[in-house]
Each structure stands twice: as structure tokens, then as C-alpha cells.
Amino acid sequence: MREYNTIFNHALAPITPGPSSSNTCGPVRIGLICQQLLGEIPAKAVVEYYSKGAFTTTLYGMKSDVAFINGLLGKEQNNPEFNAAYTIAKEVGMDVSFAEVDDLTVGGMETVRIRMTDQSGFEMVVIGESIGGGAFKIHYIDDC
């Protein structure tokens, strides 16, 4: 399918399944960069969010959980199967969970630490932050 640059996608905001670009596009993109850094769909992923951060109240209601899973599956935010992320993760054998933690104080209110394990047992940790408008920052990649 051919993609066209449009003012709506590239100047105003990314195409997002909603309800909020910082709660869906940012998390999808964080998950996607994590999957790309790992080099494959993780066998296991734990998405940790700060107990005093924004995801404590928005993770499930704003579909951020679904967005992180889509990214970890290597899918973009405009993927037509966006809402089926949990089912697809199960089908491909990805064990994913979410955990509230007290020790994640780097970054802003929408920061997560994603702990991933690949099929061979290799582990990687990435800390990323959704900063609005579908943009994100990576604060940490395995001691880098």
C-alpha cells in the first residue's frame, strides 16, 4: 500500500488509534524500538511503570497496554489489528505483563522500563518516555 505524506500525519500529529497520542502512539513507538533493539519479538516482556506516574491511571483505560504490546510485536500504531494485541501476543508465544514499581524515577510522568527476554534467554532493559504527540525519548539501554 502506498503511503502519502499529509499535513495531518506529519505536521499536526501522527495517525493514532486514540484516544491520545501520548498514550497510544508514544507507547507503540517505545515498544517498537524495544523490539527492534532486541532483534525479535520478545519471548517475555515486563512493562514497568512508576507508581506515581501517569500510567497508574491511564494504562488500561487509554489503551497504553495494548499500544506497548503492539510495538513489542513489531506493529505500527495504525495497524488494523491494534485491539487484538493480547490475542496476537498469545498466539506468537509472547508472555507480556505490566507492573507498578516505586524505583522508576528517571524521566517524566509517562516513563516505563521494559525488561525483555528473547527466545535464547538474552535479557535487555530499556527505559523510555512518551513525551506527547507520538514522540518519545529513550533514557536507558542496558547500561549505555
Descriptions of predicted regions:
Residues 26, 30, 34-39, 46-50, ...:
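Accessory carbohydrate-recognition regions in carbohydrate-active enzymes
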